[in-house]
């Protein structure tokens, strides 16, 4: 009974192993959703395969740095996770090129977090000059939800954050998840439906 209790069924047609959700998903391990990193060296080494090399406790019980290495692609990805006194999770990522050749980075997520499959809608904020923070509500489905800023700075039309709500959530009650990217440049956030029925949420810069 252990496989039924501890594992998840493999949906057809898919790889014959269960690729678990991670904080830094990548193509090299068989993850076919949005990845945490898009980078290459002259068109090669684009499918990174990270493995944990060290865990550094910054504050035991509250903050740590997870160091992930790919010796073939010659890169190190360090993920900083911190839970503050209000139970807000802070995520930061740092990418280091450990090779001799130039590495072209097209996208790096500050973090990847799971969302429950019953998540119903995403509430984001749009606008224009003197009319910022206008509420935009979109239903979540099996389509990819994406919001992107290409202006190279903070914009009036694309706030780097959103709120994901479960059914029945209002401004005063219910279950919601909020996230904000602390970056005043080009940025992107995506919410993607996964094959197991859950969602993943990414925010980062490009």
Map each language-model feature to its residues.
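Polysaccharide-binding surfaces and accessory modules of carbohydrate-active proteins
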Residues: 1-206
């Amino acid at each position: 009974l252990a496989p039924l209790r501890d594992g998840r069924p493999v949906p057809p047609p898919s790889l014959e192993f269960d690729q678990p959700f991670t904080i830094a998903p990548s193509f090299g391990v068989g993850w076919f959703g949005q990845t945490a990193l898009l980078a290459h060296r002259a068109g090669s080494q684009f499918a990174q395969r990270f493995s944990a090399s060290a865990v550094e406790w910054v504050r035991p019980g509250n903050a740590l740095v997870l160091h992930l290495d790919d010796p073939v692609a010659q890169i190190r990805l360090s993920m900083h996770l911190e839970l503050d006194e209000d139970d807000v999770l802070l995520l930061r990522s740092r990418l280091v090129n450990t090779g001799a050749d130039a590495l072209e980075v097209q996208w790096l997520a500050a973090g990847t977090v799971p969302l429950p499959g019953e998540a119903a809608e995403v509430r984001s904020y749009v606008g224009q000059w003197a009319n910022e923070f206008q509420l935009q509500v979109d239903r979540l489905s099996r389509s990819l939800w994406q919001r992107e800023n290409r202006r190279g700075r903070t914009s009036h039309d694309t706030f780097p954050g959103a709120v994901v709500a479960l059914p029945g959530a209002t401004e005063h009650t219910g279950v919601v998840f909020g996230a904000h990217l602390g970056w005043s440049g080009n940025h992107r956030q995506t919410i993607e439906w996964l094959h197991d029925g859950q969602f993943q949420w990414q925010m980062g810069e490009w």
